[in-house]
Regions:
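Binuclear metal-dependent hydrolase catalytic cores
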Residues: 23-159
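Bacterial Sec-dependent N-terminal signal peptides
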Residues: 1-24
């Protein structure tokens, strides 16, 4: 079922991009991360590939995430709020010479693995204390976020 929802999300994004591209031909997707939920190397990993990445930071990879970028409107949307969100948002801003808002127009959470929603906590009062960042999720995850801390605090404070 999880894979079906992920595929449906990707199809919806693809369809939306096609519609959006009809109006804004320059919109594109930028990869912000490609690794599984824990990033690469994984915490506690002592295998050869992990050891190389610990020794050579250029081999490290952020958790899987995408940015949908509209260069005409200077807006962007984030797909998945990962544990690497601080670095991903900073790097995005640097790559684009701060021409875009630091925060995205909205955040789409594709599914409920920890690598896809735990970065939302960085929007809370202890870090950025954002105001009304739009987050798009499926109903079951919406209920989870509204009913469980620390996520419910984000909802309550309208971060």
């Amino acid at each position: 079922m999880k894979h079906i929802l992920s595929v449906l999300c990707l199809l919806a994004v693809s369809f939306w991009l096609q519609l959006y591209n009809a109006q804004t031909p320059d919109a594109y997707v930028e990869v912000l991360g490609v690794a599984q939920d824990g990033g690469f190397p994984h915490m506690g990993c002592n295998k050869e590939g992990c050891n190389l990445a610990w020794e050579h930071p250029e081999l490290r990879r952020n958790v899987s995430s995408l940015a949908l970028v509209d260069p005409v409107q200077k807006k962007w949307w984030l797909f998945d709020a990962t544990p690497d969100i601080r670095r991903q948002l900073h790097d995005f801003s640097q790559r684009h010479n701060r021409e875009y808002p630091y925060l995205p127009e909205g955040v789409f959470i594709t599914h409920a693995h920890i690598g896809h929603y735990t970065g939302l906590m960085e929007f809370g009062k202890e870090v950025m204390n954002t105001k009304q960042v739009k987050v798009y999720v499926l109903p079951k995850l919406k209920n989870f976020l509204e009913s469980n801390g620390p996520w419910s605090q984000l909802v309550g404070l309208k971060n």
